[in-house]
């Protein structure tokens, strides 16, 4: 067995195409998952049970099932419903890439929402009391105090989740 440089040169365009698809999945799923996670975070910290409970159920289901099962359900299960095949989303869900983006976004949203919630809960109460002493409203405290500190606290775990998403995006290929 010898090292065949010609085989590597011939395979390079296919490998580069795979890298492009992987990064496309990573960016699109990461952004959609982050937007979903922010919505879930706001539902979780709202203090309203009718927002908190559905978010908890969603997070419990998507964190409790393997991503491969979720991809199979999206790719093989959703087309079983006539309403899905007749919807405006069918051209996207008909393709494997669209199904992978949907499944990865839903899964990432569940994990990232818990990462962000941990960051929000990690903000020291004394800092929020200082904001109240300065006359800040609850909205101002959340925007100017909680969000920057929570972002800093959640960033290491979020970067780990982005790396996990990169690895999971290879399932599609």
Residue ranges and their predicted role:
Residues 1-172:
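Transmembrane alpha-helices and adjacent helix-loop boundaries
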């Amino acid at each position: 067995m010898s090292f065949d440089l010609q085989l590597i040169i011939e395979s390079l365009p296919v490998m580069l195409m795979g890298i492009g698809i992987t990064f496309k999945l990573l960016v699109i799923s990461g952004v959609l998952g982050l937007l979903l996670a922010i919505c879930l975070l706001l539902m979780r910290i709202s203090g309203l049970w009718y927002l908190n409970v559905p978010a908890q159920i969603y997070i419990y289901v998507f964190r409790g099932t393997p991503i491969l099962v979720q991809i199979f359900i999206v790719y093989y299960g959703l087309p079983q419903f006539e309403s899905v095949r007749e919807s405006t989303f069918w051209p996207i869900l008909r393709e494997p890439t669209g199904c992978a983006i949907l499944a990865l976004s839903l899964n990432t949203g569940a994990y990232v929402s818990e990462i962000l919630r941990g960051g929000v809960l990690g903000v020291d109460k004394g800092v929020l009391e200082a904001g109240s002493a300065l006359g800040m409203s609850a909205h101002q405290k959340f925007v100017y105090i909680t969000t920057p500190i929570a972002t800093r606290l959640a960033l290491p775990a979020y970067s780990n989740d982005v790396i996990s998403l990169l690895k999971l995006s290879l399932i599609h290929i």
